Amino acid sequence: MSVPGPAAVPVVFDVNVLVLAVAVGESPFRSWPSPPPTSGNPSADCLGVVNDAAEFALWLSPHILAHTGRVLATVLKTPDDEVDDYLRALAEMADASGGGITDPPQTVGDGPDWEDNRILDLAAAVGAFLVVSADADLTGLSPWRGRPIIEPPQFASMAGASRRARRRRR
């Protein structure tokens, strides 16, 4: 009988993190970097951490996926087939990491921005340990109901430091 490993920590990434992961610099979309930081793109490094399916479980909502796709298609003019491929990759990554996609009820009104409150709805619904965002309004709410809201470079750095410490203990 094997003993299960530690449970993955639930995390929520803001839409801006998901967009910046493929919109800034050299996107490592086809092979997310691991361990971070390796790409020079902290948002991509965040996805690299989750893609490893080791420590963190990514949670998404239909709203977050739709908004990510909308920004990529309308603002950044990303071709529809590339948007679809990316959203499918995010959904697969969330599932493989131990997270998934859920449609939380809209109950949070703590922030001044409706979109930010949808991120917080998801964090509350899945019991996220932390939220990762590049939005100053959202990070300004940290800690929100006891949950840190940190920026992508902090998350990537924290995960990298944790992995280095584990390797030294072996």
What label would you give each PLM region?
Residues 1-58:
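Short, well-structured N-terminal submotif of metal-dependent ribonuclease cores
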Residues 12, 131-132:
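Structural motif
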Residues 15, 62, 134-136:
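Short secondary-structure boundary segments
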Residues 20-22, 71, 141, 158-159:
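Residues that scaffold the ATP/ADP-binding catalytic core of kinase and kinase-like folds
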Residues 47-106:
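PIN-domain endoribonuclease scaffold, especially VapC-family toxins
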Residues 50, 122, 141:
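Hydrophobic/aromatic ligand-binding patch that stacks against planar heteroaromatic rings
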Residues 91-130:
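Active-site neighborhoods of divalent-metal-dependent phosphate/nucleic-acid chemistry enzymes
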Residues 109, 113, 129-130, 136-170:
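Acidic, PIN/NYN-like endoribonuclease modules and their adjacent C-terminal/linker elements
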